[in-house]
Amino acid sequence: MNRLLSVFALGGAVLLAGCVAPTPSPTTRTMRRCCRAPRCRQRPTTVRSTRPVSSRTCTATARRSGWVTSSPSRSMSATSASKNAGSQIAKTSKTDIGLTSLFGSTPNTNNPFGGGDLSLEAGYSGDRATKGDSKATQGNTLTGSITVTVAEVLPNGNHRRARQKWLTLNTGEELVRIAGMVRADDIATDNTVPSTRVADARITYSGTGSFADASQPGWLDRFFISPLWPF
């Protein structure tokens, strides 16, 4: 009898456990929270900007922290810089001291090292010259677009945006990073901002791998071109 009651109790517990909804995993909760669409509040609010926005109507323009937008860099396709510098310093000095007599007499002493007699005459001459030339030329081209995130909304309505993109290739990785400040009025209806409209822009394009290592000088070359090198 006791064994039969135990079997019924175990079966009831299994049935109750099957009726309980499964607990979502942390990944599921995170995805639901990230992919949740923003709701339109009925209470009107005004964004501190030159153009007021009411939350009664949903807008696709990214104006709040965490929203994303695209920043094409087609308008800044090429930049170049060149610098030349040259310096030359020359100095020549010569000194002659000749005394024919000392207190009315002409000293004449034999030179113990040979080569004639010692006298009161002395002379010095020296030349020094320094010359340096330097030339630097730099050019780059960057074309494409990157999606950035609104990192911060300032009290005046401007947005701080930053994002980076990593491209993994079979010979290394390439990094494209852009950060800067954007006005809310410069955001187009398709959520794009030209790179020429980004204030305090910091654009980084670098990479890792064999190609990036090939463009760097070796450790011995870096030693000889160091600013601490005296020559």
From Swiss-Prot:
| Predominant localisation class | membrane
The coiled-coil segments of this chain are none
An MF annotation (GO) of this entry: cytoskeletal motor activity
Q: Where is the lipid attached (S-diacylglycerol cysteine)?
A: 19
Q: Localized where?
A: Cell outer membrane; Bacterial flagellum basal body
Keywords in alphabetical order: Bacterial flagellum, Cell outer membrane, Lipoprotein, Membrane, Palmitate, Signal
Function in brief: Assembles around the rod to form the L-ring and probably protects the motor/basal body from shearing forces during rotation.
The answer to whether keyword Membrane applies is: yes
Q: Would the keyword Membrane be found if you checked this record's keyword annotation?
A: yes
Q: Which protein, by its recorded name, is this?
A: Flagellar L-ring protein
Locate the region Disordered: 46-90, 103-140
Q: PROSITE patterns in the record, alphabetically? A: PROKAR_LIPOPROTEIN
Task: List, alphabetically, the GO terms of the cellular component aspect.
Answer: bacterial-type flagellum basal body, distal rod, L ring; cell outer membrane
Q: How does it sit in the membrane?
A: Lipid-anchor
Give the signal sequence positions: 1-18
| GO BP terms in the entry | bacterial-type flagellum-dependent cell motility
Quaternary structure and partners: The basal body constitutes a major portion of the flagellar organelle and consists of four rings (L,P,S, and M) mounted on a central rod.
The record's section on InterPro entries has: Flag_Lring
Polar residues biased stretches: 47-62, 103-112
From which domain of life does this come?
Bacteria
Please give the sites of covalent lipid attachment annotated as N-palmitoyl cysteine: 19
Q: Which family does it belong to?
A: Belongs to the FlgH family.
Q: Name one Pfam family in it.
A: FlgH
Q: List all Low complexity biased stretches.
A: 69-82
